């Protein structure tokens, strides 16, 4: 059982993120094993992260050593990268993912971005010539085939606006179960949350702490004076206050830390709650999206502005 429960769609409420800079298989493998011991059951990866193989190794060892009874006790999520967001490349991409993971299926397979690149473009920097128009219908039909074949128990999307979800739902035979997007106290996603609830789509938060330390991240979440004051008054860390806030919205969340102490802290958000006054203070924090997808916007590409990429929703 997951230490933190599951959403109605079956997605564990708290997952371990594994997007790391550079090839680091040993730390990822060790961190996943320790996370399983601590109670994590959801592990979030992607073809673009290059961490699928160590997650698969850790999962196999966890089953072999009895940390979990079987593969079915774990929930593994991966994502198809933009270079494989083509009708004829989605299924082969998932088969490679499964080979990396040494698994017969993933629990959730998602479209990483509503973006298509030329085949083979996996590493930045990207040029305008690398981008092609995103054929949402073709890509989603390929995702549905992955589900029908039993290779993905569920399918979803990442970084989709309300407008893009509306378009997808207009033709999808199998609707997306999850939309994984940036959510934190500095980017609260009220409109998107309301839309997804109405449509039965589970939100899952990435960068719930603001992705401090990444090339695109920000200190604005962890350095928030409001969050520091609330944390001090409750005897919690700022990270715990952020994660608890996301948790109270009904969202699932992905949090990345390979430090054992912080991994434990990040699970300790379930048996306490924020007061109404604290929620109100957080609701008034000025809003600013941190991960704007800058590298996918180009005057010569399909998305010529942030307005086009996010449909005016940032």
UniProtKB/Swiss-Prot annotation:
Q: What are the GO cellular component annotations? A: cytosol
* GO process annotations (BP): cellular response to zinc ion starvation; response to iron ion starvation; siderophore biosynthetic process
What is this enzyme's catalytic activity, as reactions?
2'-deoxymugineate + NAD(+) = 3''-deamino-3''-oxonicotianamine + NADH + H(+); 2'-deoxymugineate + NADP(+) = 3''-deamino-3''-oxonicotianamine + NADPH + H(+)
Keyword NADP in annotation? yes
Q: Which GO terms describe its molecular function?
A: 3''-deamino-3''-oxonicotianamine reductase activity; aldose reductase (NADPH) activity
Question: InterPro entries of this UniProt entry?
Answer: AKR, AKR4A/B, Aldo/ket_reductase_CS, NADP_OxRdtase_dom, NADP_OxRdtase_dom_sf
Q: Record's SUPFAM superfamilies?
A: NAD(P)-linked oxidoreductase
Q: What is this protein called?
A: Deoxymugineic acid synthase 1
Organism, scientific name: Zea mays
């Amino acid at each position: 059982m997951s230490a933190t429960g599951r959403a109605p769609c079956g997605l564990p409420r708290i997952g371990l993120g594994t997007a790391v800079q550079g090839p680091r298989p040993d730390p990822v493998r060790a961190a996943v094993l320790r996370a399983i011991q601590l109670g994590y059951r959801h592990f979030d990866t992607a073809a673009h992260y290059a961490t699928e193989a160590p997650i698969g190794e850790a999962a196999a060892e966890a089953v072999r050593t009895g940390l979990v009874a079987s593969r079915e006790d774990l929930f593994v999520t991966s994502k198809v990268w933009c270079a494989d967001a083509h009708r004829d490349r989605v299924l082969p991409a998932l088969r490679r993912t499964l080979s990396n993971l040494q698994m017969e299926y993933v629990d959730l397979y998602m479209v990483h971005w509503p973006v298509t690149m030329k085949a083979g473009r996996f590493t930045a920097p990207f040029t305008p010539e690398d981008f092609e128009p995103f054929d949402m219908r073709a890509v989603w039909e390929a995702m549905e085939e992955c589900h029908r074949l039993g290779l993905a128990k569920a399918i979803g999307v990442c970084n989709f606006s309300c407008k893009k979800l509306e378009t997808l739902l207009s033709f999808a035979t199998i609707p997306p179960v999850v939309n994984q997007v940036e959510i934190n106290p500095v980017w609260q996603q009220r409109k998107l949350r309301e839309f997804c609830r109405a449509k039965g789509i589970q939100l899952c938060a990435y960068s719930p702490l603001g992705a401090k330390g990444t090339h695109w991240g920000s200190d604005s979440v962890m350095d928030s004076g409001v969050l520091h004051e609330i944390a001090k008054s409750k005897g919690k860390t700022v990270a715990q206050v952020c994660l608890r806030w996301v948790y109270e919205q009904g969202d699932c969340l992905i949090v990345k830390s390979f430090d054992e102490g912080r991994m434990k802290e990040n699970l300790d958000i379930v048996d306490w709650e924020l007061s109404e006054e604290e929620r109100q203070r957080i609701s008034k924090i000025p809003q600013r999206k941190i991960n704007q997808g800058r590298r996918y916007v180009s005057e010569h590409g399909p998305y010529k502005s942030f307005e086009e990429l996010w449909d005016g929703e940032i």
